């Protein structure tokens, strides 16, 4: 095996997805602790604590206790190199999260055992399904009252439409939580409370049918054995092929706060989750072990460092090897650039990078020339596919306070839209400018950045738009007919794509019925 193939085989690149407050920040911290990346866990605490999350670094995040922007953290574990992408849990930032999911090879879904499947989890799972991303599930908060575990598995299957195969099974919960039973290995991993901030040696009882197990479970023993028979009869057995196809999720139980069960999840990612995979481009498929370098940008983050006012483009390496000072082609611009100062991330610790391989995430300094979806290669002209734009869910008309600044306003809105958190639309029938976003928070962010960076003051007005759909049609004649009829509701987005702005859900359903030849797309790719 070449050095490069060996390096690729070591890589595991995954994201954590969850509904806000399911415990994602805590589990991130515990994973870093497993990799000994944080000496004392407890630095990644949200909201109420004064020790702030190493992965929640932006000022607005610190104030609100939510991860707004995706952080990337790399750490070693069991002779592998783990790239962990933390995704925003706050609902306003789902686009950022969606695109992060294009940069990973697997995902860890964290569910609150007391609440089960929640809305944001459903939305994120839909995105994982678009790419058949393998999903590992962790049911968290076993140190509190949780719902019936069998009910939770049924809900995962019914709502998320994926087979659930329990790998571990909880013994009691809340004050009676005794640990978990590993179904395939026939052993009990004992829960020792109160060790959230340190790694402790795991205590294991081999075989459920043993005196030691009976003594540990006490009164719970007989009921647990019965429950287990039911579980083994009713639940799926784990099938690695089905997992790799995105059809089945292995399920683990534990408590991230109590630092219990997280190591089993990380072991599962190392043992079962895929190493970096081949990636599709418009021209061909690119293998991670190819000698020549390639990668794509899935995120741009402004002002990551208050000390240096900068923008960083996050790039997923898809093939070859990055070496300091190498030349690479910025395919969209057709230009060769020398990259001497790419960054690797240990959350807010940014370090200059000497080399990196497929699966790794590196940061490039961006002076306004790099856009989301851009491909970099070592000379070859191809573009990676599948980096999505999603239809916004909220719309506002933008009103300029100084009419003489309309040029700056257009430029500002288009440049901010390039970062991918908002989208701008220009209606065909008038000179309005409409801003679309996935959450209210983004409108505030845009207004303050327009004022700061472009010296433009704007206000927002309500507008009668329910949703946007990108229009595609193979039949020119039908498309022209549609454009004439739907003229009132048509606009062009910042990238020049024809878009239908539907005033209501009913209106959109009617249009889809009336125009079967027109495709109303809720997503489109970055080109």
From Swiss-Prot:
It is found in: Cytoplasm. GTP binds at residues 18-25, 86-90, 140-143. GO terms for cellular component: cytosol. SUPFAM superfamilies: EF-G C-terminal domain-like, P-loop containing nucleoside triphosphate hydrolases, Translation proteins. InterPro entries: EF-G-like_DII, EFG_III/V, G_TR_CS, P-loop_NTPase, PrfC, RF3_C, RF3_dom_3_sf, RF3_GTP-bd. One of its GO terms (biological process) is translational termination. One of its GO terms (molecular function) is GTPase activity. Pfam families: EF-G_D2, GTP_EFTU, RF3_C. CDD domains: RF3, RF3_II, RF3_III. Residues 9-277 form the tr-type G domain. The keyword Nucleotide-binding applies. Keywords: Cytoplasm, GTP-binding, Nucleotide-binding, Protein biosynthesis. NCBIfam families: prfC, PRK00741.1, small_GTP. PANTHER family: PEPTIDE CHAIN RELEASE FACTOR RF3. Belongs to the TRAFAC class translation factor GTPase superfamily. Classic translation factor GTPase family. PrfC subfamily. Increases the formation of ribosomal termination complexes and stimulates activities of RF-1 and RF-2. It binds guanine nucleotides and has strong preference for UGA stop codons. It may interact directly with the ribosome. The stimulation of RF-1 and RF-2 is significantly reduced by GTP and GDP, but not by GMP. This is Peptide chain release factor 3.
């Amino acid at each position: 095996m070449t050095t490069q193939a060996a390096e690729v085989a070591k890589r595991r690149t995954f994201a954590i997805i969850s509904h806000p407050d399911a415990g994602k920040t805590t589990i991130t911290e515990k994973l870093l602790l497993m990799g000994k990346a944080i000496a004392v866990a407890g630095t990644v605490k949200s909201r109420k604590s004064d020790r702030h999350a190493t992965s929640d670094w932006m000022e607005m995040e610190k104030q609100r206790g939510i991860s707004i922007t995706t952080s990337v953290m790399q750490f070693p574990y069991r002779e592998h190199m783990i790239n962990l992408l933390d995704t925003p849990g706050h609902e306003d930032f789902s686009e950022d999260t969606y695109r992060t999911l294009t940069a990973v090879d697997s995902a860890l879904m964290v569910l609150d055992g007391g609440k089960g499947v929640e809305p944001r989890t459903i939305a994120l799972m839909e995105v994982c399904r678009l790419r058949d991303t393998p999903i590992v599930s962790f049911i968290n908060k076993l140190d509190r009252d949780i719902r019936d575990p069998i009910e939770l598995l049924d809900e995962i299957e019914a709502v998320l439409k994926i087979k659930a195969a329990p790998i571990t099974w909880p013994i009691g919960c809340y004050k009676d939580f005794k640990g978990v039973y590993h179904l395939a290995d026939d052993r009990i991993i004992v829960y020792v409370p109160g060790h959230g901030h340190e790694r402790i040696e795991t205590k294991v009882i081999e075989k459920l049918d043993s005196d030691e197990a009976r003594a540990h479970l006490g009164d719970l023993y007989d009921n647990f054995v019965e429950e287990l028979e039911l579980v083994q009869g009713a639940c799926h057995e784990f099938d690695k092929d089905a997992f790799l196809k995105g059809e089945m999720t292995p399920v683990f139980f534990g408590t991230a706060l109590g630092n219990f069960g997280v190591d089993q999840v990380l072991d599962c990612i190392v043992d079962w989750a895929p190493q970096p995979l081949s990636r599709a481009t418009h021209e061909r498929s690119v293998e991670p072990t190819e000698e020549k370098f390639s990668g794509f940008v899935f995120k741009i983050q402004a002002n990551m460092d208050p000390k240096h006012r900068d923008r960083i483009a996050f790039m997923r390496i898809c093939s070859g090897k990055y070496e300091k000072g190498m030349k690479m082609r910025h395919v969209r611009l057709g230009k060769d650039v020398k990259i001497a100062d790419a960054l690797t991330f240990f959350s807010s610790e940014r370090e200059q990078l000497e080399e990196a391989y497929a699966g790794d995430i590196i940061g490039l300094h961006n002076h306004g020339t790099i856009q989301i979806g851009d491909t970099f290669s070592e000379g070859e002209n191809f573009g990676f596919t599948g980096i999505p734009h999603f239809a916004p869910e909220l719309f506002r008309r933008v009103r300029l306070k100084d009419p003489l600044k309309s040029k700056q306003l257009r430029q500002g809105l288009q440049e901010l839209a390039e970062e991918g958190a908002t989208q701008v639309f220009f209606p065909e029938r008038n000179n309005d400018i409409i801003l679309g976003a996935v959450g209210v928070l983004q409108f505030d962010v845009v207004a303050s950045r327009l004022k700061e960076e472009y010296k433009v003051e704007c206000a927002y007005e309500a507008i009668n738009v329910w949703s946007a759909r990108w229009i595609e049609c193979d039949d020119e004649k039908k498309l022209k007919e549609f454009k004439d009829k739907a003229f009132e509701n048509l606009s062009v987005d910042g990238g020049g794509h024809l878009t239908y702005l539907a005033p209501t859900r009913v209106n959109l359903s009617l249009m889809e019925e009336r125009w079967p030849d027109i495709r109303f797309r809720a997503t489109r790719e970055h080109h």
